[in-house]
A protein has these predicted regions:
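Residue-level recognition of the "H+4" position in the DHp/HisKA helix
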Residues: 16, 23-27
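Conserved C-terminal segment of the DHp
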Residues: 27-42
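Short alpha-helical segment of the dimerization/phosphotransfer core of two-component systems
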Residues: 54-62
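Conserved micro-motifs of the catalytic ATP-binding
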Residues: 74-79, 117-120
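Conserved catalytic submotifs in the C-terminal HATPase_c
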Residues: 82, 107-116
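Short beta-strand/loop element within the Bergerat-fold HATPase_c
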Residues: 143-153
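Glycine-rich/acidic phosphate-handling loop/turn and adjacent ATP-lid/helix
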Residues: 160-187
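Conserved glycine-/histidine-rich ATP-lid loop and adjacent helix of the Bergerat-fold HATPase_c
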Residues: 192-206
């Protein structure tokens, strides 16, 4: 028996199963979003649908991260960088997330956008930022601000909320392992975000994730 071949087959099966579940979850999410927009939905059901929408987005982000990590481990090229207009990406993030956050009385707004263009994988970066914004559904009090600026040769995307901030363990600069739970994360999302950042490299510069409290949670994605 070829243990290496068996492991490869098992990995392929798991990746395929995760992909199928992700597709099914996407259908559930689309249906929930469609029903939520219907005027005839009772208030009590509307609240449940919004929670379902939030949790489905969170699970979908985790599955996308898991698939991405599978591809990285298999040596697949995950990052396909291109020139991206930063303001367009911010507008896209606002459009996708504003309605859900507004249902909780949270205003999602654009802050200062100093970077006109960046060179990165738009899909991966949008996925990371959407997951971070969706997470503020539980932790922001009333406001979340998206901004983008240039610093030391990096394009920096920032998600700032007015909640209680990140816990000490998440601020310790020690990368969380997948499955390790903390105040605001299961670990997988942050682990994948760090890997996406690190896969963006230019000359001597390597992308990174920076977490701070200002005093609410401040997530920064630094892309060279």
């Amino acid at each position: 028996m070829d243990d290496g071949r068996d492991e490869e087959i098992f990995t392929d099966l798991v990746a395929s199963a995760v992909h199928d579940v992700k597709n099914s979850l996407a259908l559930v999410l689309n249906s929930a979003e469609h029903i939520t927009d219907m005027e005839a939905v009772p208030a009590a059901a509307h609240e449940s649908l919004l929670l379902l929408q939030h949790e489905a987005r969170r699970a979908n982000a985790d599955l996308m991260g898991l698939l991405g990590l599978f591809k990285i481990e298999r040596g697949s090229s995950l990052v396909r960088p291109a020139v991206v207009e930063c303001e367009d990406l911010i507008v896209e993030l606002l459009a996708y997330n504003s309605g859900l956050l507004a249902s909780r009385g949270i205003t999602l707004e654009a802050g200062e956008i100093q970077a006109a263009e960046g060179y990165f994988d738009r899909g991966l970066v949008a996925g990371v930022l959407n997951a971070v914004i969706n997470n503020t559904f539980r932790f922001a009090r009333s406001r979340v601000t998206l901004s983008c600026h240039l610093e030391d040769g990096f394009t920096v995307f920032r998600v700032l909320d007015d909640g209680e901030g990140y816990g000490p363990k998440m601020l310790s600069n020690q990368p969380q392992e997948p499955g390790e739970h903390s105040h605001r994360s299961t670990g997988l999302g942050l682990f994948f975000a760090r890997r996406v950042a690190e896969l963006h490299q230019h000359r001597e510069r390597i992308g990174r994730v920076v977490l701070t409290n200002r005093p609410g949670g401040c997530f920064e994605l630094w892309l060279p």
